Amino acid sequence: MAVVDLAAAVVFWGGLALVAYVYVGYPLTLRLWPARPLRKTAAAEPPAVTVVIAAFNERVHIEDTVRNKLAQDYPAGRLDIIVVSDGSVDGTDDIVRRIGDPRVTLLRQEPRQGKTMALNRALEVATGEIIVFSDANSTYQPDTVRRLVAAFEAPEVGYVTGQLHYLERGETAVGSGSGAYMRYENWLRQLESR
C-alpha cells in the first residue's frame, strides 16, 4: 500500500469515526453518564426578570410577542420587558408604545446596527437579576419564564435554554411535524442538562 493510499485511508476512516462520534458516540456518552442531582435553594421571593426582544420591522408579530410575555405566569412586579427597535420603519415602535404597559420599555437604535448590538444595548439598561432573550416572533407557554427561573435555584446553573418548536401561525406543536434535527437537538440538550 502506497503512502498516499495509507494517508487517504487514514483521512477517510478518521473522518468517518469523527462523524460517528458526533451522531452516535457523544449522545451515547451523555446517555450513559450518570445524572447528577442539583442542590436547589429556593429564594425568599422570585428574582427580577428582564425579557429582552430585538426587533427589526416586526409590525406583524411584535404586539402578540410582547403581550405573550406580559401574560406570563410570573409575578408582574418582578417582570419587565425591553424592546429594542433596530431601525424599524414599519410602525413597530408605534405598536410597542400603544401597548401602554409600564413594564415595557422601548429603545430605538438608529441607524440599524443588527441584533447583537440591539441585545447589548438592552443589557446596558436591564435591571433583572435574570435576563431572558426572545425573538420578536416567538411566543412562550404561560409558565415558560417561571420554569426557566426555577432552574437557577441550583447555584451551579449558569444558563438555561428552552425547547424551540417552529410553528406556522395558528399551528400547534402536535401538528407541526417538527423537524428531526430540532428533536435531536432538544434531546441532546436534555441529556446535557442531567
Feature map (PLM): residue ranges:
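N-terminal membrane-anchoring/stem segments of glycan-assembly enzymes
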Residues: M1-A43, Y184
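Short, acidic, metal-binding catalytic loop of nucleotide-sugar glycosyltransferases
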Residues: R67-R78
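Acidic helix N-cap motif at the loop->helix transition within catalytic regions
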Residues: H61-D64, R78, V89-R98, L106, ...
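Short aromatic/hydrophobic "clamp" motif used to bind/position activated sugar donors
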Residues: I131
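Conserved donor NDP-sugar-binding/catalytic core segment of glycosyltransferases
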Residues: T139-S176
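A conserved acidic beta->alpha catalytic loop
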Residues: S85-D94, P111, S138
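Cell-envelope/extracellular polymer assembly enzymes that use nucleotide-activated donors
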Residues: P47-T50, D80
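Glycine-rich, basic loop-to-helix element that forms the pyrophosphate-binding segment
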Residues: Q109-A126, R183
